[in-house]
UniProtKB/Swiss-Prot annotation:
It is found in: Cytoplasm. The gene is galK. Its main location: cytoplasm. Coiled coil: none annotated. This is Galactokinase. The keyword Cytoplasm applies. It comes from the Bacteria. Catalyzes the transfer of the gamma-phosphate of ATP to D-galactose to form alpha-D-galactose-1-phosphate (Gal-1-P). The active site is at D173. Keywords: ATP-binding, Carbohydrate metabolism, Cytoplasm, Galactose metabolism, Kinase, Magnesium, Metal-binding, Nucleotide-binding, Transferase. One of its GO terms (cellular component) is cytosol. It comes from Staphylococcus carnosus (strain TM300). Its EC number is 2.7.1.6. ATP binds at S66, G123, A124, S125, L126, S127, S128, S129. Substrate binds at E32, H33, T34, D35, Y223.
Length: 388
């Protein structure tokens, strides 16, 4: 890929790239919609991601091109014009990173050229947007010798998502893209940003990613609505509990104080956030003791909660996960990511991968009308520079 990208870079910009980098996508093993509720998450970086090449310019022009959106062509704007622009589509993610780096005091004193190409399926809920954000920060760090640390880039990436794009997401995606490590997941406390690397050793079992192939736009989904519902539920619980987030409430305490939330929808939203947080801790413990059956059971319970209490699945994700759960050799399956479309994951015996794909494809096509896609990817490193 890099060879063809270098040739394309020369064609587009009539110069050679000075720096190259790769930022991964991610899966979240368990812990969905807990990151903006101050809870735990359990993500891992994957070896699908976004590649980028960059060079400085002698003017103030920023020129961005994506091989994934060739029909859009080169998107150009000035270093002094960093406003959100709907016509700039994907380029708003890197534009936001430039804006917030500059506002943080980092010197980006000229324009630049950037070419990117990703192999994360677009709209698959495998975190392509965070991959682009962190990739952009990493390229600019080298290009302009910025003394910016990984954690600050992660925080700025979230700021891009929240304040520039308009999605009130948590920090999980940017964190795992920036901090991932090969063959390890991260148990992250999103309230404190304390984290632990955990080996992703599943014995004879592997994680299979199943894509609904249904597109969704996160900013236009009910993501922000769920955040508001959780905030409303938290405010009711705070009448008697001294807590800052739903993630700070254990299941027993919640059950004792659930009467404070009279509206059923708000009760269910809070119940998911709190029980899912407990499931993350239980899943971490199960993986440590190599209890893959219990880990799979927790995946199933997570999906049921996301379907019934949080209502972020939909017929496509439900068909994938619930069909996979019935396949022999599958210990558990659930949606991963924000929901509404995107992907599900299954913990499947390595000898049953073909059975999983065949059985899920048949039922999914019969019910939905088109086929899902399957990926088997290794757990990889976070953002890194690569040799040109």
């Amino acid at each position: 890929m890099l060879t063809s990208m270098k040739s394309k870079f020369d064609t587009l910009f009539n110069t050679q790239p000075e720096v190259a980098a790769f930022a991964p996508g991610r899966i979240n093993l368990i812990g969905e919609h807990t990151d903006y509720n101050g809870g735990y998450v359990f993500p891992a970086a994957i070896e699908l991601g976004t590649y980028g090449l960059a060079s400085k310019r002698n003017d103030n022009k920023i020129c961005l091109y994506s091989n994934n959106f060739e029909s859009t062509g080169t998107i150009e704007f000035s270093l002094d014009e960093l406003q959100f622009d709907t016509t700039h589509s994907w380029a708003n993610y890197p534009k936001g990173m430039v804006k917030f780096l500059k506002e943080s005091g980092y010197q980006i004193d000229s324009g630049f050229n950037i070419l990117i190409e990703g192999n994360i399926p677009n709209g698959a809920s495998l975190s392509s947007s965070a991959s682009i954000e962190i990739l952009m920060g990493w390229l600019l760090k080298a290009l302009f010798n910025l003394e910016v640390e990984r954690l600050e880039l992660i925080e700025l990436g979230r700021k891009v998502e929240n304040q520039f794009i308009g999605v009130n997401s948590g920090i999980m995606d940017q964190f795992i893209v920036g901090m991932g490590r090969k063959d390890q997941a991260i148990l992250l406390d999103t309230a404190t940003l304390e984290y632990h690397y955990v080996p992703t050793e599943f014995g004879d079992y592997v994680i299979s990613i199943m894509n609904t192939n249904k597109r969704r736009e996160l900013a236009e989904s009910k993501y922000n609505e769920r955040l508001k519902e959780c905030q409303s539920a938290l405010a009711l619980l705070q009448q008697e509990l001294d807590v800052d987030a739903l993630g700070h409430i254990d299941v027993t305490t919640f059950e004792k104080h659930a009467y404070l939330i009279e509206e059923d929808v708000l009760l269910r939203r809070a119940r998911h956030a709190i029980t899912e947080n407990a499931r993350v801790k239980e899943a971490h413990a199960a993986l440590n003791r190599k209890d893959f059956i219990e880990f799979g059971r927790l995946l199933n319970a997570s999906h049921a909660s996301l379907k019934n209490d949080y209502e972020v699945t939909g017929i496509e994700l439900d068909t994938l996960a619930e069909t996979a759960q019935q396949v022999e050799g599958v210990l558990g399956a659930r949606m991963t990511g924000a929901g509404f479309a995107g992907c599900a994951i299954a913990l499947v015996h390595k000898d049953r991968i073909k059975d999983l794909e065949e059985e899920v494809t048949k039922i999914y096509k019969d019910k939905i009308g088109y086929e899902p896609s399957f990926y088997h990817v290794d757990i990889g490193d976070g953002v890194k520079y690569i040799k040109i």
